[in-house]
C-alpha cells in the first residue's frame, strides 16, 4: 500500500476540502451544458436562479454559515437550525466547523500573505477555490470557546462531510434527476464561484472595504469593512445611509438577535 494511502489520508478526504469545492466549480459547467441539452421547461431554470440566489447564497452562506454558525449573531429554533445546516453544507464549501475555523483565521490574519485563507493575498485566481489556502491549526492555532462548541455539536459532520453531501445529493437524484441537477448541482456550483469572487472583492486593495454598491448588491455582503470593525454586530449597517440585506433577510426566520456587539454611536 502506498505511504500516502492510509486511514489518515482517507479520513482527510471525507472532510471539507479545496478539492471538493473545486470539483463543484468545474462540474457546474458540464451540468449547465447538460441542462441546456435537456431542453426542460422554463420553470426549472427559474428554480435554479432562486436556489442559487436565495437558498444557497443568501440563506446557506450569508445567514447560516456566516452570521449564525460562525459569529452567533442570533439564535433560532431547532427546525430552522437544521434548515441552516442543510442549505449551508450543501453548497460544497464546508460545514459549520470548517467554515468557522477558516473565517476566524481570516479575521485574525486579514490580508496576511500565506496565512489569510482567502482574498487578494492568493491572487485573482483564488476565485477558483483550489487556489485558496486551507487552515492549518498547527501554523495558526485557534483558541475559541465558540469553535469548541461547534466541534462538539457538529464534529460528526466535519468528519463525514463529503459522504453527507453525496448522500443528500443521491436522495435528490432519487426524487427526480431534474431536482438534483437544477435545484442543487447547478445552483450550488454557481454559488461556489460567487462566494469565491465575493471574498476576493471584499478585500480590494488588500484591505476590507465597504462596497459603494452595497445598497443594490443584496446577494453578497457589501459592508465588509464594517463587519471587520464590528464582527459581533448582527447588523453591519451601522449608519443611517447603509443597509445590510443579509440582516434584513434573516428576519424571516424570527431570530433572537444578540445586540451586545452592535455599535450605536457610529457617525457618517
For the regions a language model picked out, list residue spans one by one.
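Non-catalytic, topology-defining segments of multipass membrane proteins
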Residues: 1-197, 233-268
Amino acid at each position: 500500500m502506498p505511504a500516502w494511502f492510509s486511514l489518515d489520508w482517507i479520513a482527510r478526504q471525507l472532510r471539507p476540502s479545496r478539492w471538493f469545492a473545486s470539483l463543484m466549480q468545474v462540474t457546474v459547467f458540464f451540468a449547465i451544458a447538460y441542462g441546456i441539452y435537456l431542453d426542460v421547461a422554463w420553470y426549472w431554470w427559474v428554480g435554479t436562479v432562486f436556489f442559487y440566489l436565495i437558498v444557497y447564497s443568501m440563506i446557506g452562506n450569508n445567514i447560516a454559515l456566516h452570521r449564525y454558525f460562525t459569529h452567533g449573531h442570533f439564535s433560532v429554533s431547532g427546525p430552522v437550525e437544521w434548515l441552516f445546516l442543510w442549505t449551508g453544507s450543501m453548497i460544497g464549501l464546508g460545514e459549520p466547523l470548517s467554515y468557522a475555523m477558516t473565517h476566524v483565521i481570516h479575521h485574525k490574519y486579514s490580508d496576511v500573505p500565506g496565512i489569510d485563507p482567502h482574498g487578494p493575498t492568493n491572487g485573482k485566481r483564488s476565485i477558483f477555490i483550489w487556489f485558496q489556502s486551507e487552515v492549518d491549526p498547527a501554523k495558526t492555532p485557534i483558541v475559541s470557546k465558540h469553535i469548541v462548541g461547534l466541534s462538539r455539536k457538529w464534529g460528526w459532520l466535519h468528519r463525514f462531510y463529503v459522504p453527507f453531501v453525496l448522500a443528500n445529493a443521491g436522495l435528490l437524484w432519487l426524487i427526480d434527476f431534474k431536482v438534483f441537477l437544477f435545484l442543487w448541482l447547478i445552483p450550488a456550483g454557481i454559488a461556489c464561484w460567487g462566494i469565491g469572487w465575493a471574498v476576493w472583492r471584499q478585500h480590494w486593495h488588500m484591505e476590507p472595504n465597504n462596497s459603494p454598491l452595497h445598497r443594490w448588491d443584496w446577494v453578497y455582503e457589501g459592508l465588509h469593512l464594517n463587519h471587520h470593525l464590528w464582527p459581533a454586530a448582527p447588523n453591519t449597517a451601522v449608519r443611517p445611509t447603509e443597509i445590510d440585506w443579509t440582516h434584513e433577510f434573516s428576519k424571516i426566520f424570527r431570530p433572537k438577535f444578540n445586540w451586545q456587539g452592535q455599535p450605536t454611536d457610529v457617525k457618517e
